[in-house]
């Protein structure tokens, strides 16, 4: 009786031991993600491992097709995704379009070496990335071809690069002669296709009105007189009315419309510079010339096209131009052309009927060529037999209708825009240096910083050497003569 029991007990013990050595597979997950061990691939191992790569890639593709054909619900959402061995280049020799920003744990961005690919390439180092990119990776990688966030983030990136569009002029010189450095954000950093147009003239000569004609392109049937020329003009970019300044409760005093240098950028990226009047009324006589010289020297240094508004022949304006050309400061900017001079256009505003006659226009051109020719300014347009003085006549109008001596106002504005915008744009930088709007703004800031102190220093030296010495010499001679007469 004991022997059968002993044999049964020994048999049961032997079966338990054999069960530990040979486990039985009960179930297997067919839809589980296939894990691959990461490994480092060198360039010399590429040929040897090519067949292995192809087989594994075919298996992965077949497995993905099977999953798409027969999807099965997963009971394990925390299962990590499959890892693939990716090839990146050890060196920095990669195209700019393939550069990628990789996010770190702290939220910082680090420039990647190149575009990640599942196909082995001729690079040296290998890196590991997830086969299923997350939303964070899509938003952070801007150079990968497979990311979905690239197309969505491209318009936002372009909008950030574009400067805000202007709807009114902005002053460049604020109170106390301080340069407005905050205007830098209104200029494009990389745009090189722009034109700088400045205007100079006396008080109430029509400088702001001319810039209003260049600020926007309008149709021929546009009511220019009602919106831009009349006293009730309501669509002027640059102010054309006098400002009222109260005088201790008494009657108001008319102030100039433009009191400081200001600019406006059009949709076509034309930078329009409006200036205060030359030789303004009410300024101190000692600083009147210095104020005008600083503004004129600044525009001669930073403009492509300069409009000189003339009302007859102003010899004071010619004297200031000669002084500004000879005494303007040297700008030490990289690539800037020394002694740069813009293309000059003479505009006769409020011209009368007699000014449109052929003999009168030829006489005016000869006078301007004789006076402004020695300055060296480019005042001509055309070449060969078509070379003539660059002048334009704008009549004094009271409506949009045409008269016996000029066309309608819409046609005159069209001709004026073609004349100004069609002028030769003289470059202010060498050919090897591309002048962008941001670089031009730095040149403008440098000229504004040097112009006013430069002319004040010259005036102080002239006054010390000539004016003060002459007064002292006269007083000394008078005293000497009076003492000799008494003796």
UniProtKB/Swiss-Prot annotation:
Role of this protein: Involved in nonsense-mediated decay (NMD) of mRNAs containing premature stop codons. Probable component of kinase complex containing nonC and recruited to stalled ribosomes.
Bridged cysteine pairs (disulfide): none
Biological process per Gene Ontology, one example term: gravitaxis
Superkingdom of origin organism: Eukaryota
Record protein name field: Protein SMG9
Entry keywords, A to Z: Nonsense-mediated mRNA decay
InterPro entries documented for this protein: P-loop_NTPase, SMG9
Membership in a protein family: Belongs to the SMG9 family.
Spans annotated as Disordered: 30-83, 136-164
UniProt source species: Drosophila melanogaster
Entry keyword Glycosyltransferase: no
Compositionally biased spans, kind Basic and acidic residues: 42-70
Keyword check for Electron transport: no
């Amino acid at each position: 009786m004991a022997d059968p029991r002993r044999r049964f007990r020994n048999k049961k013990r032997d079966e338990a031991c054999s069960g530990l050595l040979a486990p039985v597979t009960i179930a297997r997950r067919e839809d589980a993600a296939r894990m691959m061990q990461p490994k480092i691939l060198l360039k010399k191992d590429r040929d040897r491992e090519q067949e292995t790569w192809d087989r594994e890639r075919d298996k992965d593709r077949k497995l993905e097709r099977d999953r798409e054909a027969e999807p099965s619900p997963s009971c394990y959402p925390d299962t990590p995704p499959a890892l693939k061995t990716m090839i990146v280049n050890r060196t920095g020799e990669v195209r700019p379009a393939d550069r990628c920003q990789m996010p770190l744990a702290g939220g910082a961005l680090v420039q990647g070496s190149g575009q990640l690919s599942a196909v082995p390439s001729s690079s040296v180092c290998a890196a590991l990335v997830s086969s299923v990119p997350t939303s964070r990776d899509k938003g952070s990688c801007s150079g990968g071809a497979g990311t979905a966030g690239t197309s969505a983030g491209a318009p936002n990136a372009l909008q950030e690069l574009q400067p805000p569009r202007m709807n009114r002029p902005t002053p460049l010189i604020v109170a106390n002669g301080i340069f407005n450095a905050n205007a830098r954000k209104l200029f494009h950093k990389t745009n090189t296709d722009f034109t700088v147009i400045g205007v100079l003239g006396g008080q109430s000569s029509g400088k702001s009105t001319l810039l209003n004609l260049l600020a926007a392109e309008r149709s021929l049937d546009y009511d220019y007189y009602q919106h831009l020329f009349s006293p009730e003009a309501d669509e002027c970019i640059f102010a054309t009315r006098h400002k009222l300044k109260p005088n201790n409760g008494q009657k108001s005093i008319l102030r100039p419309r433009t009191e400081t240098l200001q600019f406006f950028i059009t949709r076509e990226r034309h930078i329009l510079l409006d200036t205060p009047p030359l030789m303004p009324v009410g300024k101190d006589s000692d600083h009147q010339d210095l104020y005008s010289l600083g503004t004129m020297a600044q525009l001669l240094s930073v403009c492509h096209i300069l409009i000189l508004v003339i009302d007859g022949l102003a010899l004071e304006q010619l004297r200031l131009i000669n002084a500004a050309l000879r005494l303007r400061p040297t700008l030490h900017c990289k690539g800037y052309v020394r002694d740069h001079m813009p293309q000059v256009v003479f505009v006769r505003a409020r011209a009368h009927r007699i000014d449109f006659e052929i003999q009168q226009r030829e006489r005016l051109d000869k006078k301007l060529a004789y006076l402004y020719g020695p300055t060296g300014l480019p005042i001509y347009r055309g070449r060969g037999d078509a070379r003539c003085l660059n002048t334009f006549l704008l009549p004094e109008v009271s409506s949009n209708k045409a008269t016996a001596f000029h066309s309608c106002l819409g046609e005159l504005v069209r001709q004026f825009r073609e004349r100004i915008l069609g002028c030769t744009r003289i470059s202010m930088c060498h050919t090897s240096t591309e002048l962008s709007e941001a670089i031009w703004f730095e040149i403008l800031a440098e000229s504004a910083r040097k112009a006013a102190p430069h002319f004040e220093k010259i005036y102080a030296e002239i006054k010390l050497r000539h004016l003060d010495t002459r007064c002292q010499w006269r007083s000394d001679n008078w005293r000497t003569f009076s003492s000799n007469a008494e003796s």
